[in-house]
A protein has these predicted regions:
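Glycine/Thr-rich phosphate-binding loops that ligate phosphate moieties of nucleotide
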Residues: 1-159
Length: 159
């Protein structure tokens, strides 16, 4: 969380942190840890959605990240779901906004607006990676919880 978070923590003050860095920590390890942290943040949001909507049989990735099989595999393995890359995944964010605008006009039926995106490919989870990520996520969740408390204390000191 580099600039605060709304879902599911609702804390504008939480920030990213690095743990267990030493003089032998490589640049690649730091870069990977950022990607893994973002994937865990996505998992937090995904879990919040699943808590109120169990209908998550298909999971699509959209935006620029959909161009990277590495990123798609990392996210899918983190959330324990195969990820679908649609033909229009790179347009996903703007297409979603356009669809919401169409629905707001009340001139379109949901069935006409929310059509299934043609599938370009599906990235299955890496079971070994998923097991490792689940263990790391448990620790990461503890760190986030602690960081939420620390962020609140730092805010008081700043003010």
């Amino acid at each position: 969380y580099l600039s605060g978070e709304r879902t599911p923590h609702n804390s504008a003050d939480i920030r990213a942190a690095f743990h267990q860095i030493n003089t032998s920590t490589s640049k690649a390890a730091i870069i990977y840890s950022v990607l893994e942290g973002v994937a865990f943040g996505i998992k937090d949001g995904f879990k919040a959605v699943e808590a109120i909507n169990k209908n998550t049989d298909e999971t699509y990735i959209v935006g620029g990240g959909s161009k990277s099989d590495f990123w798609t595999n990392l996210v899918g393995s983190a959330i324990n779901k195969s990820i679908i890359i649609g033909e229009d995944s790179n347009l996903g964010p703007s297409l979603g906004a356009a669809r919401l605008a169409m629905m707001a006009t009340k001139n379109f039926a949901g069935k006409d607006v929310f059509k299934k995106m043609p599938i370009r490919k599906e990235i299955n989870i890496d079971k070994k990676l998923s097991e490792i990520l689940n263990k790391r996520y448990a620790v990461w969740s503890e760190i986030v919880s602690t960081n939420l408390t620390i962020a609140g204390k730092l805010k008081i000191i700043k003010n």
